[in-house]
Amino acid sequence: MSDVKSVIESGRAVLGIEFGSTRIKAVLIGEDHAPIATGAHDWENMLVDGIWTYSLDMIWEGISDCYSKMAQDAKEKYGVTIKKLAAIGISGMMHGYLPFDKEDNLLVPFRTWRNTITGEAAAELTEVLGFNIPQRWSIAHLYQAILNKEEHVSKISYFTTLAGYIHWQLTGEKVMGVGEASGMFPIDSKTRDYDAAMLDKFAALDKVKEYPWDIRDILPKVLTAGEKAGTLTEEGAKRLDVSGNLESGILLAPPEGDAGTGMVATNSVAVRTGNVSAGTSVFAMVVLEKALKAVHEELDMVTTPSGDAVAMVHCNNCTSDLNAWVGLFKEFSELFGMDIDMNDIYGKLYNNALTADKDGGGLVAFNLFSGEPVIGLNEGRPMFARKPDARMNLANFMRTHLYASLATLKIGCDILFKEEKVKVDTLYGHGGLFKTKGVGQSILAAAMDAPVAVMETAGEGGPWGMAVLAAYMVNKVDGEPLEKYLSDRVFNGEKGIVMQPDPDDVKGFDEYINTYKAAIEAERAMVKALPL
């Protein structure tokens, strides 16, 4: 403890703060990268005039409350007041739209990534640029405002994301980490900067030429992990620490997005690695050796914090339907007066699923509480069906629902692995699906036909990943790449428990997916038949 105290007192600790959609979290780490103090502030987006937003006041109240709780935690644990830090890093939800005029006034309320209001712009830009531009990307928001002839557009001097805005206010620097920038505008992984040819194509659009600004001048400057991104100003220090104890002059890392910090937190920034986060929603991110051959609307292209290309498959639904069925079995046990721990119920049901027929026995389930763009559905209805000759038993039932939780992810990833022939050495699994040891892991390995590792220490998540990126900036030696720093100095060679795909499981999941795809028409009919 005295060691930690001296690390804080001498200003050697590093701080990461991440703005999630419901929680802002600060993690302070020591020289071994382990968390030593944390603080959190809950917040909720608001729907104002049909736009999902957070006010600027909410941002600053949130970050100062979060910081003061972290500082209080450090004081209570170690009896020390934080005055200096080795480095700070800010991360947040990617994408969205924060445009400012030349006097630095916000021109319209912050439009977050949740707003699906840019369909026309996203489709047109995808065609013009020959690159998939999802609706939540900043450039789609800007172009939609142009198509809508919104009067604020002519006044834009700078536009940025949430993390980019906070970093700018703390340092005065209009910069951004490459991973975060890749959610604003496409990145060229060779130059680790915005794609020059695509900038030219955007600037040449007739509707864009009507405005006085050049797209290159209003985007943030791109930096890669390890570069210095400015220092905390006196004004910035006061905004972060309202008690006035924190000194100015602290180095800041390039602000990053939640995708990049998640890659760092799971040690999956190296080429041919990836990570799968499976909870209420599910996504897979795979670091590519080279650019993809074709444009796929199912795949979002972003980058690691170092600028390597990453393909991402994001699905809205994962464990909610599974959890509902497990809850039903809990109720059944209570009818018999049994008080069984939920973890035991999950354990028994999930492990029993491993004894099932490899294809699920002819049962099929859709776990869709909401729409799923990967299979072309704007809405979803949870649904379970079977053929009359299907082998209906508990093991097949549970295996079918485990398959269903990853079915849309598999359809998206099959494009990556089967059509694009992308190779992956290891996928790191994290999230609720992997809580029951070995089960979610083996189902994911079957879905992806790839080795899946689960860390014994499920990482501390995004804010910790951001703190690690800030530590990398101040600790790295010349020429030390981020992936080496993570493997050697942060994860200390820990590879986690790796599970290879079982060929019979892979074949079984492929057979299940064929049934699932054939039944998508029934799911579509169900959405129509049961309107909300």
Language model: regions and residue ranges:
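N-terminal glycine/serine-rich phosphate-binding loop of ATP-dependent small-molecule kinases
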Residues: M1-V108, A123, K155, R216, ...
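Active-site core segments that coordinate phosphate-bearing ligands/cofactors
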Residues: S2-G11, L15-G16, I82, E120-M176, ...
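Generic structural signal for well-ordered secondary structure
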Residues: W52, L56, W60-I63, I90, ...
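Short beta-strand-loop/turn "lid" adjacent to the catalytic site in phosphate-handling enzymes
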Residues: K75-T112, N132-P134, H167-G179, G183-D188, ...
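Carbohydrate-associated surface elements
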Residues: N115
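Electropositive nucleic-acid engagement tracts
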Residues: V208-Y211, I215-D217
